Amino acid sequence: MSAPTFRLCPADIGLEVAFAGRSNAGKSSAINALTNQRQLARSSKTPGRTQMINFFNVGDADRRLVDLPGYGYAAVPLEMKKEWQVELEEYLVSRSSLAGLVLMTDIRHPLKFFDEQMLRWAKDGELPVHILLTKADKLKYGASKNALLNTRKRLKQLGLNCSIQLFSALRKEGLDELAGVMGNWYEYQLEANKIIESSFALLEGSELEDAIEKDAVQKDKNLKDSAQKESK
């Protein structure tokens, strides 16, 4: 692992809304547009390499926005991809404070394979999902509407009941609709541009390295214990 596991997340209390998407889907831009802050969610210079989970308070400490690591970037080593697929599934299915998932997908290439896998995991966890067709400014109005219609048809084929909207971080289009959906999940009136950055963050620097090392040691111990039990 090159990053902490979800076991290092804050206590599983309150309400969380997670943002997920492929490494080039515009996730950081969407979060920054929603919060009206340019660098609240930072984009890595190497897409897919940033494997930090970032938490931000939304109004109070019991309501959080969770910025999940981007997925699907080809240059990421296969072993790292497998590790994070396991972690993402565990988080989506078992995190009791998770109230909803905002899934971002590029309107020009919507619902790639791993996007659909994320939706299946969310369904397994009975988690509501709101889909953003990002970068809507890249298409003309008619093409955007067709993409929206076709994505709805695909969701129906998959047997998934998700809300969906057009979104443009560049033009700040769709912010109020997104804030309304999140507000319902938070059970809290939420306004775009008024999300407050959390005073806490996950570990960084040497503390992060220590946490990663401890987690790796614990995983090895668990595997050895399991192997010993099976051999008896």
UniProtKB/Swiss-Prot annotation:
PROSITE patterns: G_ENGB. Keywords: Cell cycle, Cell division, GTP-binding, Magnesium, Metal-binding, Nucleotide-binding, Septation. It comes from Psychrobacter arcticus (strain DSM 17307 / VKM B-2377 / 273-4). This is Probable GTP-binding protein EngB. It comes from the Bacteria. The keyword Transferase does not apply. It holds the Pfam family MMR_HSR1. The lineage of its organism: Bacteria, Pseudomonadati, Pseudomonadota, Gammaproteobacteria, Moraxellales. One of its GO terms (molecular function) is GTP binding. One of its GO terms (biological process) is division septum assembly. InterPro entries: G_ENGB_dom, GTP-bd, GTP-bd_ribosome_bio_YsxC, P-loop_NTPase. GO terms for cellular component: cytosol. Its cofactor is Mg(2+). Residues 13-188 form the EngB-type G domain.
